[in-house]
Amino acid sequence: MEKSEIQERVIKVVCQVLNIDKEMVSLDSNFVFDLGAESTQSVQLVGAFEEEFGIEMESEAALSVQTVGDAVDFIAKYIK
């Protein structure tokens, strides 16, 4: 899967979970500080990424994912 496709799908998931417009999201967007994700939404994001891409994100690794770009990079490593 191309990284651009991963990026599109990550942004789609972020918009659905956080109920925000695509225009608000960039690779540099921090889930908490820029997009306003609360702790429960952060957990929902991890679950949504796991479901969307068929991967499992361990707790420690999931905590290292702070931005949309981090999520894209993390997922790209798992589905090569």
Describe these PLM feature segments.
Residues 11, 28, 46:
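Generic structural marker for isolated residues within well-ordered, non-membrane alpha-helices
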Residues 17-36, 52-64:
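Phosphopantetheine carrier-protein modules
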Residues 36-48, 68:
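Amphipathic alpha-helical interaction surfaces in cytosolic regulatory modules
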Residues 63-64, 69-78:
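C-terminal structural segments of small proteins and small subunits
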Residues 1-23, 76-79:
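Thiotemplate assembly-line natural product biosynthesis machinery
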